[in-house]
Curated annotation (Swiss-Prot):
This is Integrase. The active site is at R212, K235, H308, R311, H333, Y342 (o-(3'-phospho-dna)-tyrosine intermediate). Disulfide bonds: none annotated. Belongs to the 'phage' integrase family. Its EC number is 2.7.7.-, 3.1.-.-. Residues 175-355 form the Tyr recombinase domain. Integrase is necessary for integration of the phage into the host genome by site-specific recombination. In conjunction with excisionase, integrase is also necessary for excision of the prophage from the host genome. It comes from the Viruses. InterPro entries: CB, DNA-bd_dom_sf, DNA_brk_join_enz, Integrase-like_cat_sf, Integrase_catalytic, Integrase_lambda-typ_DNA-bd_N, Integrase_recombinase_N, Integrase_SAM-like_N. GO terms for molecular function: DNA binding; hydrolase activity; integrase activity; transferase activity. Keywords: DNA integration, DNA recombination, DNA-binding, Hydrolase, Transferase, Viral genome integration, Virus entry into host cell. One of its GO terms (biological process) is viral genome integration into host DNA. It comes from Escherichia phage HK022 (Bacteriophage HK022). The gene is int. Residues 74-155 form the Core-binding (CB) domain.
């Protein structure tokens, strides 16, 4: 027969004890570990009863208070649906929306669909760390950036009070792709001679205009008027008017001469075209550039340069030849004043590139 409880202990719930100094402790019946509850008898009894209920139920049932608190709570996946609507209302370009959609799908896969306010920093950090462990630090950075915005919008609509993502570490990712020099460009250009002529024309057009491969493939002869090549960048929406007199001195490539060679090579609607006069895809251009690069015999530190590196080479050569501001304008990178002017014109005006040597 167990020892009878004293008067002070008689009305206490199981597992709650009072010390001689009037201090209450709760003993976990599973481990024997004790937890201090202070000297307030009413609070100690309430917390002990709640703990006993939780331990007895084995957490199989959601408590009443949790049900009350969660009645109007939005879950992560439901909020991501709302977030996609918010993105569509921002006027973001379709390509950028597709990029967002890819990251949102990853978030849905990796994080549990529970009340948004219950998503913890620990859960987010664990999810991001899985990408880092797989050597995908760049993906971790992009997904983290998206998640920061997801919760920022949730705060704006009153669903959560804090952002659990901002406390996580930003993954460090190294740019492993090698830069391309002018001499290496020439070596790859010569290695491309056995390949279709459109590859060398695309290379020259890329380096003299500084544009992305996707925009190169979309260039049409109808884009040329008033002695300028007009380009609307698919990624940024920047509208550039590049003078046909533009020449990149380090490689002795002029835009006018390159366009003339393109005209002689094909009668297609697009400036760069296959031997059958069909438009080329960015994937095809990049693949053939890789063939020429591999055939050149050049070796590189880190990952070898891709066709996209021609844009960086163009920027560096023009920076040395004309200046940094010119290079930035040619690439479509706007200064604050230019961005303001572009916003004011609602994108109707072309940024006419001027050569000021």
């Amino acid at each position: 027969m167990g020892r009878r409880r004293s008067h002070e202990r008689r009305d206490l719930p199981p597992n709650l004890y009072i010390r001689n100094n009037g201090y209450y402790c709760y003993r976990d019946p599973r481990t024997g570990k004790e937890f201090g509850l202070g000297r307030d008898r009413r609070i100690a009894i309430t917390e002990a009863i709640q703990a006993n209920i939780e331990l007895l139920s084995g957490n199989r049932r959601e408590s009443l208070i949790d049900r009350i608190k969660g009645a109007d709570a939005i879950t992560l996946h439901a909020w991501l649906d709302r977030y996609e609507t918010i993105l569509s209302e921002r006027g973001i370009r379709p390509k950028t929306l597709l990029d967002y959609a890819s990251k949102i799908r990853a978030i849905r896969r990796k994080l549990p669909d529970k009340p948004l306010a219950d998503i913890s920093t620990k859960e987010v950090a664990a999810m991001l760390n899985t990408y880092v462990a797989e050597g995908k630090s760049a993906s971790a950075k992009l997904i983290r950036s998206t998640l920061v915005d997801v919760f920022r919008e949730a705060i704006a609509e009153g669903h959560v009070a804090t952002n659990p993502v901002t406390a996580t570490r930003t993954a460090k990712s190294e740019v492993r792709r090698s830069r391309l020099t002018a001499n290496e460009y020439v070596a790859i250009y010569h290695a491309a001679e056995p390949l279709p002529i459109w590859l060398r024309l695309a290379m020259d057009l890329a380096v003299v205009t500084g544009q992305r491969v996707g925009d190169l493939c979309r260039m049409k002869w109808s884009d040329i008027n008033d002695n300028h090549l007009h380009i609307e960048q698919s990624k940024t929406g920047a509208k550039l008017a590049i003078p046909l007199t533009l020449t990149i001195d380090a490689l002795n490539i002029s835009l006018a001469d390159t366009l003339q060679q393109c005209r002689e090579a094909s009668s297609s609607e697009t400036i760069i075209a296959s031997k059958h006069h069909d438009p080329l895809s960015p994937k095809t251009v990049s693949k053939y550039f890789t063939k020429a690069r591999n055939a050149s015999g050049l070796s590189f530190d880190g990952n070898p340069p891709t066709f996209h590196e021609l844009r960086s080479l163009s920027a560096r050569l023009y920076r040395n030849q004309i200046g940094d501001k010119f290079a930035q304008r040619l690439l479509g990178h706007k200064s604050d004043s230019m961005a303001a002017r572009y916003r004011d014109s609602r994108g109707r005006e072309w940024d006419k590139i001027e050569i000021d040597k």
